[in-house]
C-alpha cells in the first residue's frame, strides 16, 4: 500500500508580494506585543522578496486561544507565525480545559529572549524586603489572570511561602496592570523583569523577589524557591520557572512548508542579531537572547516530561483563564 501524504502549499523561494502575520496571545501594549512588533519590523529584511509584516492581537485565556488558532486554524503556508505565553507548556502538561495544541508539533522558530520573573512593590510603599512583605495583610497585586507569570508567581508565593496577597485578575495586558499601579489601584505586580525594568529605572516600583532565573541588577534578590517552606512548594516553583528560558517563543503552525520554514528560521535568527534591532531593543530596555528551535523544543520536552505526581500537584495550584 502506498500512502500519499498531503503537504502544505509552497510558493517557491520568495515571499515577494506576501504579508507575514504575527499572531500575539495578548492585547497591544504588553511585553509579548512589544517583541512581536519589534520582530515584525526586522524579520522581512531577511526574507527573500522583502514581504510586509503585520501584528494580529488575539488575547484570551492567557494565550491558549492564540495557541489553538496557530495550531489548527492558521494555514501552514509560511505566512503566519505567532507568539504566546511561555507557560502554555504548563497548560498542556496539566491538561487545562480548552487546550487543543501540542507544543512539540509546532514548527518552532525559537525564542527571542529568556527572562526572569520578579515581584515588585510600589516605591512609595515602605516595604523593602521579602520579610517586610510577609508582615503585610492583603497586599494587593494586579494580574492578567491565572496562567500568566503576573498571577502564578505571587499565587505560589502566597500558597507556599507565607505571604498574604489579594490578587486582582482581569487586566488584559501587563501594560494595563502597570497603569493600575501608577494610579495606585494596586500595591504591586509580578511578571517579566524585562517588561518591568523600565519602571524600576524610573523609580516607580521596587523589586523584592525573583525566580531562579537571574539577570544583571537582580542577582541578589531572594529566590522564590528559597522562601518556600515545603519541599513540594520548592518543586512546583522550580518546574514553573523552566519555561522562562523561552520567555518569548515564536512558532509557525505544524506542517509548515519546509522551504518556507527554513527561510523563516534563518530570518528569525538573523533579525535577532541585526545591529539596528539590537539598538532599538536596548533603547526600549528589551533583552534579546536568541534561543534556537532545537533548544526551545528541549525546554518544552523537559516540562512535558514531569512525572505524574508532579503533574497532579501542579494542577492543584496552576490555573489558566482570564
Task: Tell me the role of every PLM-derived stretch.
Residues 1-6:
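Bacterial N-terminal signal peptides
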Residues 11-105, 146, 150, 159-190, ...:
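N-terminal (or domain-start) structured segment
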Residues 27-29, 86, 117, 122-127, ...:
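Short coil/turn segments
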Residues 35, 129-132, 257-268, 277-281, ...:
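Short amphipathic alpha-helical coupling segments at ligand-binding clamshell hinges
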Residues 79-82, 118, 140, 187-188, ...:
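Short, Asp-centered acidic motifs that coordinate Mg2+ and/or phosphate
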Residues 89-97, 111-126, 155-160, 245-251:
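Periplasmic solute-binding protein
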Residues 104-145, 161:
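A conserved helix-loop-strand patch within extracytoplasmic ligand-binding domains
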Residues 114, 196-272, 320-322:
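C-terminal lobe and pocket-closing loops
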Amino acid at each position: 500500500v502506498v500512502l500519499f501524504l498531503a503537504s502544505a502549499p509552497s510558493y517557491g523561494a520568495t515571499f515577494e508580494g506576501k504579508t507575514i502575520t504575527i499572531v500575539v496571545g495578548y492585547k497591544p501594549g504588553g511585553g509579548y506585543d512589544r517583541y512581536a512588533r519589534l520582530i515584525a519590523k526586522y524579520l522581512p529584511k531577511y526574507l527573500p522578496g522583502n514581504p510586509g509584516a503585520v501584528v494580529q492581537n488575539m488575547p484570551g485565556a492567557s494565550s491558549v486561544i492564540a495557541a489553538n488558532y496557530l495550531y489548527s486554524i492558521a494555514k501552514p503556508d509560511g505566512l503566519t507565525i505567532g507568539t504566546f505565553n511561555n507557560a502554555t507548556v504548563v497548560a498542556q502538561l496539566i491538561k487545562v480545559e480548552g487546550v487543543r495544541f501540542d507544543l512539540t508539533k509546532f514548527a518552532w522558530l525559537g525564542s527571542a529572549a529568556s527572562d526572569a520573573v520578579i515581584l515588585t512593590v510600589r516605591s512609595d510603599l515602605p516595604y523593602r524586603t521579602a520579610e517586610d512583605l510577609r508582615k503585610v495583610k492583603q497586599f494587593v497585586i494586579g494580574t492578567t489572570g491565572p496562567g500568566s507569570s503576573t498571577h502564578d508567581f505571587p499565587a505560589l508565593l502566597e500558597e507556599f511561602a507565607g505571604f498574604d496577597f489579594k490578587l486582582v485578575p482581569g487586566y488584559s495586558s501587563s501594560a494595563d496592570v502597570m497603569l493600575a499601579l501608577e494610579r495606585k489601584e494596586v500595591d504591586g505586580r509580578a511578571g517579566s523583569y524585562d517588561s518591568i525594568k523600565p519602571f524600576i529605572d524610573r523609580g516607580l516600583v521596587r523589586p523584592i523577589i525573583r525566580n531562579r532565573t537571574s539577570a544583571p541588577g537582580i542577582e541578589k534578590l531572594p529566590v522564590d524557591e528559597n522562601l518556600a517552606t515545603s519541599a513540594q512548594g520548592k518543586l512546583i516553583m522550580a518546574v514553573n520557572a523552566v519555561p522562562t528560558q523561552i520567555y518569548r517563543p515564536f512558532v509557525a503552525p505544524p506542517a509548515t512548508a519546509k522551504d518556507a520554514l527554513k527561510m523563516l528560521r534563518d530570518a528569525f535568527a538573523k533579525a535577532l542579531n541585526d545591529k539596528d534591532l539590537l539598538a532599538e531593543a536596548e533603547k526600549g530596555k528589551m533583552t534579546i537572547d536568541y534561543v534556537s528551535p532545537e533548544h526551545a523544543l528541549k525546554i518544552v520536552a523537559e516540562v512535558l516530561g514531569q512525572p505524574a505526581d508532579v503533574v497532579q500537584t501542579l494542577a492543584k495550584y496552576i490555573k489558566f483563564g482570564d
